Amino acid sequence: MRLDKLLANSGYGSRKEVKAVVKAGAVMIDGKPAKDVKEHVDPDTQEVTVYGEPVDYREFIYLMMNKPQGVLSATEDSRQQTVVDLLTPEEMRFEPFPAGRLDKDTEGFLLLTNDGQLAHRLLSPKKHVPKTYEVHLKSQISREDISDLETGVYIEGGYKTKPAKAEIKTNDSGNTVIYLTITEGKYHQVKQMAKAVGNEVVYLKRLSMGRVSLDPALAPGEYRELTEEELHLLNEPQA
């Protein structure tokens, strides 16, 4: 890893700023002054110090966000606010990205990380990682519709969705809410599944991903780091 990236990720400023620190002779690698920010170092085997203090290097960041409506699940956009725009400069220096996406009008659990391997495992169709949604529907839903959602319905392109789990929370006129758990992530899948049974989604929130649930203490737009236990659960093979 390049020295400037290590120092920037460890909170010593931008790459331009750490270049000045190195030039000032304040950075040591195994007791010897660093000469160039382009120098490669191994934080696992080499000791790097700045002004005599050991650098506590951290490679990855894992953030659980309650994504708000109206914000894009993207790293950048020239016209609209993205989930990364909600982060602090200290967190943005890790260059996190959303692991998967939620529609602009969808709220709920979104993982932001720079761990590409974890993101790939969570998003790979072969891994069958379950994702549970709270789905508010325009009309009441029948038991037959629930059965169809669970066995699979045909959506755009003639694709039949994989088996899902559907549970009715409330089924009153004007207040129909179901919990829907799917193991794939086709474009607008939940909305398309509702449409396939003659209904319409009016509000959508992702409650969980894998074995990790959204922290109820997080208001829309708020986020926190994953706990060690939550990270362990995300890394575990899915049943």
UniProtKB/Swiss-Prot annotation:
PROSITE patterns per the UniProt record, alphabetical: PSI_RSU, S4
Domain S4 RNA-binding: 1-65
Gene3D superfamilies: Alpha-L RNA-binding motif (3.30.70.1560), Pseudouridine synthase I, catalytic domain, N-terminal subdomain (3.30.70.580), RNA-binding S4 domain (3.10.290.10)
Positions annotated as active site in the UniProt record: D103
One GO BP: enzyme-directed rRNA pseudouridine synthesis
MF term (GO), any: rRNA pseudouridine synthase activity
InterPro entries given in the database record: PsdUridine_s_RsuA/RluB/E/F_cat, PsdUridine_synth_cat_dom_sf, PsdUridine_synth_RsuA/RluA, PsdUridine_synth_RsuA/RluB/E/F, PsdUridine_synth_RsuA/RluB_CS, RsuA_PseudoU_synthase, S4_RNA-bd, S4_RNA-bd_sf
Keyword RNA-binding among record annotations: yes
Enzyme class: isomerase
Listed EC numbers: 5.4.99.-
Reaction(s) catalysed by this chain's protein: a uridine in RNA = a pseudouridine in RNA
Keywords: Isomerase, RNA-binding
UniProt-listed Pfam families: PseudoU_synth_2 (PF00849), S4 (PF01479)
Family the UniProt entry places it in: Belongs to the pseudouridine synthase RsuA family.
PANTHER family, per database record: PSEUDOURIDINE SYNTHASE, PSEUDOURIDINE SYNTHASE FAMILY PROTEIN-RELATED
Matching NCBIfam families: pseudouridine synthase
Name of the protein described by the UniProt record: Uncharacterized RNA pseudouridine synthase YtzG
Organism expressing this protein natively: Bacillus subtilis (strain 168)
Originating gene: ytzG
